[in-house]
Amino acid sequence: MARFVFITGGVVSSLGKGLASAALGALLQARGFSVRLRKLDPYLNVDPGTMSPFEHGEVFVTDDGAETDLDLGHYERFTGVAARRTDSVSSGRIYSNVLEKERRGDYLGKTIQVIPHVTNEIKDFISIGEDEVDFMLCEIGGTVGDIEGLPFFEAIRQFGQDKPRGQCIFMHLTLLPYIAASGELKTKPTQHSVKELRSIGIAPDVLVCRSEGPIPQKERDKLALFCNVRPESVIAAQDLKSIYEAPLAYHREGLDQAVLDAFSISPAPKPDLTVWHDVADRIHNPEGEVNVAIVGKYTQLEDAYKSIAEALTHGGMANRVKVKSEWIDAEIFEREDPVPHLEKFDAILVPGGFGERGTEGKIKAAQFAREHKIPYLGICLGMQMAVIESARHLTDLTDAGSEEFDHEAGKRRFTPVVYHLKEWVQGNHKVERKVDDDKGGTMRLGAYTAKLVEGSKVAQIYGSTTIEERHRHRYEVDIQYRDQLQAEGLIFSGMSPDGRLPEIVEVKDHPWFIGVQFHPELKSKPFAPHPLFADFVRAAKEVSRLV
């Protein structure tokens, strides 16, 4: 049966609970334990699938088609354990489940209340798969004191009471602000945060304190005294140059040992951190630099493309180079010539997105890359824009576009080389969708198999003609235009197994021009860079004349 670590936050949000959880998971793995990480979000959305990227950042999609918080991406990248639908839940999902049960009569006419019905639903979620791993790490979103988070805090308090003594511990992450005028780290906000946590019945076993620099022993002792934790369980979490330093940094601070001590696991297996030393070496000792332009729609918030940024870093590590990314708003190219903006880059990446805004700019970026022989990677919408660009400029389909952008019924503005996907095969059954279906959870989501053309560039990159990648889209390139486009050099090099859905296109006689309908960034890891990103950076490296 698993041991449970509940990770909570205080003082301010966005302190890095997800990274701390992921790093702890990696350290426990390094000691030979199996782990699974979960995220419990207090917001009332059922999932992040319909939330604006500006509100929430990227949506991380799992193999089984769940749309989840970006922290699950950190969990996967640090542990290599594929996340599942049962690793993410929100207040919206919990309340929805409770109300469905009430409508079915499952509660036998009782008055439905937060305690016990909502808290029991949360506890049931936490318990899923508890016999599968040695450690279950559960991160609670938000900060202690948030109204919407109270049912989750109450649920984990009860959970700790329900389990045998020594099977659950609580780790609290806080901020130690530095006051420049006095030259001091202030512990009072952390003391009040722990006081708030204790007032609802949760006493932290481990205290992780974010700070700009080292925490003097005097402050550690003070925190241990006033927060009622052991001095060795006050862990400093200093700002780092790279998130991939976190496992080694937390190990030096003794986080993994503090957790094992809290569980009375002694003697503890020694960690094998070889892989993380190699990762750190590749980050800190690059042999060159490449410049990549990311032409997107949500560039004001880098978290909107979090997995893409990390996958590029992984590609750089595979090639021993530093990837310097510059985010460019695609709308700029709708007003200005893209050449002065793009000619300085070694490669161009156009990521996914929804809606018409900025798409003409993305098309111009694809055109620049194709005509100037610059490596191009188009992901999801980025592939669709590359296909539209080729259709407009290489064939007689000069009005090529996407059904997504034809808003008025009966008034077609484009020849729809990209159409609304209404049916597809998933496993052994057919999935059907209607245009007026709910937006949430109705896209083509999760892992699907693709067949690659033997001898194609992508088949060489993958080293296989069969791949499985994660998808998140409701629009698709129309297969009826394949012959027309292939005659002009746009090769359809990857297809769904039934041959109906284009998955990958590549430009013939181009050094590196690939568009993919799926999201390869979701499966990249620092110790196992995704082959597409590794080869994309290799191509950029050649352009930069580093080879």
Swiss-Prot record:
Allosterically activated by GTP, when glutamine is the substrate; GTP has no effect on the reaction when ammonia is the substrate. The allosteric effector GTP functions by stabilizing the protein conformation that binds the tetrahedral intermediate(s) formed during glutamine hydrolysis. Inhibited by the product CTP, via allosteric rather than competitive inhibition. UTP binds at residues 13, 186-191, 222. GO terms for molecular function: ATP binding; CTP synthase activity; glutaminase activity; identical protein binding; metal ion binding. The keyword ATP-binding applies. SUPFAM superfamilies: Class I glutamine amidotransferase-like, P-loop containing nucleoside triphosphate hydrolases. Gene3D superfamilies: 3.40.50.880, P-loop containing nucleotide triphosphate hydrolases. Its EC number is 6.3.4.2. The keyword Zinc does not apply. CDD domains: CTPS_N (cd03113), GATase1_CTP_Synthase (cd01746). It holds the Pfam family CTP_synth_N. Residues 291-546 form the Glutamine amidotransferase type-1 domain. L-glutamine binds at residues 353, 381-384, 404, 474. Catalyzes the ATP-dependent amination of UTP to CTP with either L-glutamine or ammonia as the source of nitrogen. Regulates intracellular CTP levels through interactions with the four ribonucleotide triphosphates. Homotetramer. This is CTP synthase. The gene is pyrG.
